[in-house]
Protein backbone atom coordinates (compact mmCIF):
# COMPACT_ATOMS: atom_id res chain seq x y z
CA UNK A 1 0.00 0.00 0.00
CA UNK A 2 1.29 3.44 -0.89
CA UNK A 3 1.65 5.83 2.04
CA UNK A 4 0.55 9.46 1.78
CA UNK A 5 1.83 11.12 4.98
CA UNK A 6 1.09 14.66 3.80
CA UNK A 7 -2.51 13.79 3.06
CA UNK A 8 -2.82 12.12 6.46
CA UNK A 9 -1.51 15.23 8.16
CA UNK A 10 -3.95 17.39 6.24
CA UNK A 11 -6.90 15.25 7.21
CA UNK A 12 -6.02 15.56 10.89
CA UNK A 13 -6.11 19.35 10.89
CA UNK A 14 -8.32 19.96 7.88
CA UNK A 15 -10.99 21.98 9.73
CA UNK A 16 -8.54 24.75 10.48
CA UNK A 17 -7.14 24.69 6.95
CA UNK A 18 -10.63 25.10 5.57
CA UNK A 19 -11.25 28.09 7.80
CA UNK A 20 -8.00 29.62 6.62
CA UNK A 21 -9.20 29.61 3.01
CA UNK A 22 -11.49 32.48 3.96
CA UNK A 23 -8.86 34.19 6.09
CA UNK A 24 -8.64 37.29 3.93
CA UNK A 25 -12.22 38.17 4.83
CA UNK A 26 -11.42 38.72 8.49
CA UNK A 27 -7.63 39.19 8.61
CA UNK A 28 -7.88 42.95 8.93
CA UNK A 29 -9.79 42.56 12.20
CA UNK A 30 -7.14 40.44 13.94
CA UNK A 31 -5.63 42.30 16.93
CA UNK A 32 -1.85 42.32 16.81
CA UNK A 33 0.38 41.76 19.83
CA UNK A 34 0.88 39.41 22.74
CA UNK A 35 -1.65 36.84 23.82
CA UNK A 36 -2.85 38.05 27.22
CA UNK A 37 -5.46 36.91 29.72
CA UNK A 38 -7.91 39.58 28.57
CA UNK A 39 -7.39 38.71 24.93
CA UNK A 40 -8.20 35.05 25.56
CA UNK A 41 -11.20 35.97 27.73
CA UNK A 42 -12.64 38.05 24.88
CA UNK A 43 -11.99 35.34 22.29
CA UNK A 44 -13.58 34.32 20.01
CA UNK A 45 -15.98 37.28 19.98
CA UNK A 46 -13.27 39.87 19.28
CA UNK A 47 -11.36 37.75 16.76
CA UNK A 48 -13.29 34.70 15.56
CA UNK A 49 -10.54 33.79 13.12
CA UNK A 50 -7.98 33.21 15.86
CA UNK A 51 -7.39 30.14 17.98
CA UNK A 52 -5.41 31.53 20.89
CA UNK A 53 -5.20 28.65 23.33
CA UNK A 54 -5.90 24.95 23.77
CA UNK A 55 -9.63 24.46 23.26
CA UNK A 56 -9.85 27.99 21.76
CA UNK A 57 -10.47 29.91 25.00
CA UNK A 58 -10.35 29.40 28.77
CA UNK A 59 -13.74 27.69 28.61
CA UNK A 60 -12.31 25.30 26.00
CA UNK A 61 -15.45 25.58 23.88
CA UNK A 62 -13.70 24.33 20.73
CA UNK A 63 -16.27 26.13 18.61
CA UNK A 64 -15.54 28.51 15.75
CA UNK A 65 -17.87 31.47 15.25
CA UNK A 66 -16.79 31.91 11.63
CA UNK A 67 -19.72 31.76 9.25
CA UNK A 68 -18.06 31.61 5.82
CA UNK A 69 -18.29 27.81 5.80
CA UNK A 70 -21.94 26.82 5.57
CA UNK A 71 -24.27 24.58 3.58
CA UNK A 72 -23.97 26.88 0.56
CA UNK A 73 -20.18 27.11 0.47
CA UNK A 74 -18.96 23.76 1.74
CA UNK A 75 -19.01 22.15 -1.72
CA UNK A 76 -16.46 24.71 -2.93
CA UNK A 77 -13.88 23.96 -0.25
CA UNK A 78 -10.53 22.70 -1.43
CA UNK A 79 -6.97 22.18 -0.28
CA UNK A 80 -5.24 25.50 0.43
CA UNK A 81 -1.84 24.06 1.36
CA UNK A 82 -0.17 21.16 3.13
CA UNK A 83 3.19 20.75 4.80
CA UNK A 84 5.14 17.85 6.25
CA UNK A 85 6.12 18.27 9.91
CA UNK A 86 6.61 14.71 11.10
CA UNK A 87 7.08 11.07 10.21
CA UNK A 88 5.35 7.75 10.68
CA UNK A 89 6.83 7.25 14.17
CA UNK A 90 4.73 9.94 15.85
CA UNK A 91 1.18 11.16 16.28
CA UNK A 92 -0.27 14.64 16.06
CA UNK A 93 -3.02 15.06 18.65
CA UNK A 94 -3.07 18.82 19.18
CA UNK A 95 -5.08 21.51 17.45
CA UNK A 96 -2.78 24.15 15.94
CA UNK A 97 -3.03 27.62 17.47
CA UNK A 98 -3.52 30.62 15.17
CA UNK A 99 -2.30 33.98 16.45
CA UNK A 100 -1.91 37.12 14.34
CA UNK A 101 -1.92 35.14 11.11
CA UNK A 102 0.70 32.65 12.30
CA UNK A 103 -0.04 28.98 12.99
CA UNK A 104 1.86 27.33 15.86
CA UNK A 105 1.85 23.54 15.88
CA UNK A 106 3.89 20.77 17.49
CA UNK A 107 4.67 17.30 16.22
CA UNK A 108 4.89 14.08 18.21
CA UNK A 109 8.50 14.69 19.27
CA UNK A 110 7.61 18.13 20.66
CA UNK A 111 9.13 20.07 17.76
CA UNK A 112 7.42 23.45 17.34
CA UNK A 113 6.69 24.95 13.92
CA UNK A 114 5.58 28.51 13.22
CA UNK A 115 3.87 28.61 9.82
CA UNK A 116 2.37 31.37 7.75
CA UNK A 117 -1.32 30.58 8.03
CA UNK A 118 -2.02 31.80 4.51
CA UNK A 119 0.73 30.02 2.60
CA UNK A 120 1.93 27.26 4.92
CA UNK A 121 5.50 28.51 4.60
CA UNK A 122 7.75 27.85 7.58
CA UNK A 123 8.65 30.97 9.56
CA UNK A 124 10.75 29.17 12.15
CA UNK A 125 11.23 25.76 13.71
CA UNK A 126 12.36 24.84 17.21
CA UNK A 127 13.62 21.32 17.94
CA UNK A 128 14.05 20.42 21.63
CA UNK A 129 16.11 17.41 20.51
CA UNK A 130 14.26 14.82 22.57
CA UNK A 131 16.22 11.60 22.98
CA UNK A 132 14.32 9.05 20.87
CA UNK A 133 14.95 6.36 23.48
CA UNK A 134 12.17 8.00 25.51
CA UNK A 135 9.73 6.20 23.23
CA UNK A 136 9.83 3.55 25.98
CA UNK A 137 7.60 5.87 28.04
CA UNK A 138 4.87 5.97 25.43
CA UNK A 139 1.62 4.46 26.66
CA UNK A 140 -0.30 4.35 23.41
CA UNK A 141 1.89 3.73 20.40
CA UNK A 142 4.20 6.32 18.84
CA UNK A 143 5.38 9.57 20.41
CA UNK A 144 2.63 12.17 20.59
CA UNK A 145 2.02 15.73 21.72
CA UNK A 146 -1.23 17.61 22.25
CA UNK A 147 -0.09 21.09 21.36
CA UNK A 148 1.47 24.29 22.59
CA UNK A 149 0.53 27.42 24.53
CA UNK A 150 1.11 30.96 23.26
CA UNK A 151 1.25 33.63 25.94
CA UNK A 152 2.95 36.98 26.60
CA UNK A 153 5.32 36.79 23.64
CA UNK A 154 6.33 33.16 24.10
CA UNK A 155 5.39 29.71 22.85
CA UNK A 156 5.46 26.91 25.45
CA UNK A 157 5.72 23.19 24.85
CA UNK A 158 5.93 20.16 27.11
CA UNK A 159 8.38 17.61 25.75
CA UNK A 160 8.27 13.85 25.53
CA UNK A 161 11.26 13.63 27.89
CA UNK A 162 9.55 15.66 30.62
CA UNK A 163 10.77 19.21 30.06
CA UNK A 164 8.83 22.47 29.75
CA UNK A 165 10.31 24.92 27.26
CA UNK A 166 9.59 28.54 26.36
CA UNK A 167 10.66 30.01 23.02
CA UNK A 168 10.33 33.50 21.61
CA UNK A 169 7.08 33.80 19.67
CA UNK A 170 8.62 35.88 16.87
CA UNK A 171 12.04 34.27 16.40
CA UNK A 172 11.72 30.74 17.79
CA UNK A 173 14.78 31.28 19.98
CA UNK A 174 14.82 29.43 23.29
CA UNK A 175 14.02 31.60 26.32
CA UNK A 176 14.16 28.95 29.06
CA UNK A 177 14.15 25.18 29.48
CA UNK A 178 13.30 23.39 32.74
CA UNK A 179 13.13 19.73 33.71
CA UNK A 180 9.79 19.10 35.42
CA UNK A 181 10.76 15.70 36.82
CA UNK A 182 11.32 15.10 40.55
CA UNK A 183 13.18 11.78 40.94
CA UNK A 184 11.91 10.63 44.41
CA UNK A 185 13.28 7.19 43.54
CA UNK A 186 10.45 6.74 41.04
CA UNK A 187 10.41 6.32 37.27
CA UNK A 188 10.91 9.01 34.68
CA UNK A 189 7.76 10.31 32.97
CA UNK A 190 6.86 11.99 29.71
CA UNK A 191 4.72 15.01 28.91
CA UNK A 192 2.14 14.65 26.16
CA UNK A 193 -0.39 17.29 27.22
CA UNK A 194 -0.52 20.90 26.10
CA UNK A 195 0.60 23.50 28.66
CA UNK A 196 -1.97 26.03 29.85
CA UNK A 197 -0.92 29.64 30.42
CA UNK A 198 -2.78 32.30 32.41
CA UNK A 199 -2.34 34.72 35.32
CA UNK A 200 1.37 35.10 34.56
CA UNK A 201 2.08 31.40 34.90
CA UNK A 202 2.39 28.25 32.80
CA UNK A 203 0.85 25.03 34.15
CA UNK A 204 1.86 21.49 33.25
CA UNK A 205 1.24 17.95 34.48
CA UNK A 206 2.75 14.73 33.16
CA UNK A 207 1.98 11.38 31.59
CA UNK A 208 3.23 7.81 32.13
CA UNK A 209 0.89 7.25 35.09
CA UNK A 210 -0.23 3.95 33.61
CA UNK A 211 3.36 2.68 33.67
CA UNK A 212 3.58 2.30 37.45
CA UNK A 213 6.05 3.85 39.90
CA UNK A 214 4.90 7.37 39.10
CA UNK A 215 3.49 10.03 41.42
CA UNK A 216 1.39 12.75 39.86
CA UNK A 217 1.67 16.48 40.39
CA UNK A 218 1.02 19.75 38.59
CA UNK A 219 3.58 22.56 38.57
CA UNK A 220 3.07 26.27 37.93
CA UNK A 221 6.04 28.09 36.43
CA UNK A 222 6.60 31.81 36.11
CA UNK A 223 5.94 32.52 32.43
CA UNK A 224 8.83 34.99 32.19
CA UNK A 225 11.58 33.18 34.08
CA UNK A 226 10.65 29.50 34.24
CA UNK A 227 10.99 29.52 38.03
CA UNK A 228 8.63 27.30 40.03
CA UNK A 229 5.74 29.30 41.48
CA UNK A 230 4.13 26.31 43.20
CA UNK A 231 3.68 22.57 42.89
CA UNK A 232 0.58 20.61 43.86
CA UNK A 233 1.00 16.89 44.42
CA UNK A 234 -1.98 14.73 43.51
CA UNK A 235 -1.23 11.66 45.61
CA UNK A 236 0.62 11.50 48.95
CA UNK A 237 4.21 10.40 49.36
CA UNK A 238 5.99 8.53 52.16
CA UNK A 239 4.10 9.41 55.37
CA UNK A 240 7.30 9.05 57.42
CA UNK A 241 8.53 12.21 55.70
CA UNK A 242 7.01 15.70 56.02
CA UNK A 243 4.08 16.22 53.68
CA UNK A 244 4.72 18.78 50.94
CA UNK A 245 1.46 20.60 51.69
CA UNK A 246 -1.54 20.06 54.01
CA UNK A 247 -3.69 18.43 51.34
CA UNK A 248 -1.30 15.47 51.26
CA UNK A 249 -1.84 14.77 54.95
CA UNK A 250 -5.57 14.62 54.25
CA UNK A 251 -5.05 12.36 51.24
CA UNK A 252 -2.73 9.96 53.08
CA UNK A 253 -5.56 8.98 55.42
CA UNK A 254 -7.38 7.40 52.45
CA UNK A 255 -4.55 5.11 51.34
CA UNK A 256 -3.38 1.73 52.69
CA UNK A 257 -0.26 -0.40 52.65
CA UNK A 258 3.00 1.06 51.36
CA UNK A 259 1.54 2.89 48.37
CA UNK A 260 4.40 5.37 48.16
CA UNK A 261 6.78 2.63 47.01
CA UNK A 262 4.63 2.29 43.89
CA UNK A 263 4.22 6.02 43.36
CA UNK A 264 0.44 5.80 43.35
CA UNK A 265 -0.14 7.28 39.89
CA UNK A 266 -2.62 10.13 39.68
CA UNK A 267 -0.99 12.02 36.85
CA UNK A 268 -2.70 14.96 35.15
CA UNK A 269 -1.68 14.26 31.60
CA UNK A 270 -3.78 16.92 29.90
CA UNK A 271 -6.90 18.15 31.71
CA UNK A 272 -6.09 21.59 33.12
CA UNK A 273 -8.62 24.43 32.89
CA UNK A 274 -8.17 28.04 34.07
CA UNK A 275 -11.18 29.85 35.55
CA UNK A 276 -10.63 33.61 35.39
CA UNK A 277 -13.68 34.41 37.52
CA UNK A 278 -12.45 32.43 40.53
CA UNK A 279 -8.73 32.66 39.66
CA UNK A 280 -8.54 28.89 39.91
CA UNK A 281 -7.04 25.98 38.02
CA UNK A 282 -9.18 22.86 37.66
CA UNK A 283 -7.12 19.69 37.48
CA UNK A 284 -8.44 16.42 36.09
CA UNK A 285 -6.52 13.66 37.86
CA UNK A 286 -5.96 10.29 36.22
CA UNK A 287 -5.95 6.68 37.35
CA UNK A 288 -3.87 4.97 40.01
CA UNK A 289 -0.66 3.02 39.46
CA UNK A 290 -0.60 0.10 39.59
CA UNK A 291 -4.18 -0.12 38.42
CA UNK A 292 -5.41 -2.79 40.91
CA UNK A 293 -6.13 -1.08 44.22
CA UNK A 294 -5.29 -4.17 46.26
CA UNK A 295 -1.74 -3.99 44.92
CA UNK A 296 -1.05 -0.27 45.22
CA UNK A 297 -3.18 0.43 48.32
CA UNK A 298 -4.30 -2.78 50.08
CA UNK A 299 -7.00 -2.04 52.61
CA UNK A 300 -7.12 1.55 51.46
CA UNK A 301 -10.14 3.76 51.07
CA UNK A 302 -10.85 6.42 48.46
CA UNK A 303 -7.18 6.89 47.44
CA UNK A 304 -7.31 10.66 47.10
CA UNK A 305 -6.84 12.40 44.73
CA UNK A 306 -7.08 9.70 42.06
CA UNK A 307 -9.87 10.14 39.50
CA UNK A 308 -10.69 13.52 40.99
CA UNK A 309 -11.39 17.08 39.90
CA UNK A 310 -9.25 19.36 42.06
CA UNK A 311 -9.63 23.16 42.20
CA UNK A 312 -6.43 25.02 43.09
CA UNK A 313 -5.87 28.73 43.69
CA UNK A 314 -3.47 29.88 40.97
CA UNK A 315 -1.71 32.38 43.23
CA UNK A 316 -1.05 30.15 46.23
CA UNK A 317 -1.22 26.65 44.79
CA UNK A 318 -3.50 25.60 47.64
CA UNK A 319 -6.64 23.55 47.14
CA UNK A 320 -10.06 25.20 47.07
CA UNK A 321 -12.10 21.99 46.84
CA UNK A 322 -12.14 18.55 45.26
CA UNK A 323 -14.70 16.14 43.86
CA UNK A 324 -13.71 12.51 43.41
CA UNK A 325 -15.58 10.90 40.55
CA UNK A 326 -14.40 7.33 41.25
CA UNK A 327 -13.49 6.65 44.90
CA UNK A 328 -11.07 3.76 45.29
CA UNK A 329 -10.35 3.70 41.56
CA UNK A 330 -9.66 0.12 40.55
Q: Where are the language model's segments positioned?
A:
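Acidic, proline/glycine-rich low-complexity intrinsically disordered segments
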Residues: 51, 59, 65, 85, ...
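N-terminal secretory signal peptides that target proteins for export/translocation
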Residues: 1-10
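Blade/loop signatures of beta-propeller domains
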Residues: 28-79, 238-248
Amino acid sequence: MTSYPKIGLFLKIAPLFFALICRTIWAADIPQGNVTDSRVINSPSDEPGSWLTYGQNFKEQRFSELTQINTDTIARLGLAWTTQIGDYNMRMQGTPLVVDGVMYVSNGWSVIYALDATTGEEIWKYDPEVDRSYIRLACCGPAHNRGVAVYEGKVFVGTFDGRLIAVNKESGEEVWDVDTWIPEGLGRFNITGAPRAAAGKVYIGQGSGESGHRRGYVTAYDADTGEVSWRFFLVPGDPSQPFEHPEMELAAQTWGGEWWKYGGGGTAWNSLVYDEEFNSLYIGVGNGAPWPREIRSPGGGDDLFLSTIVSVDVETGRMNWYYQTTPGDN
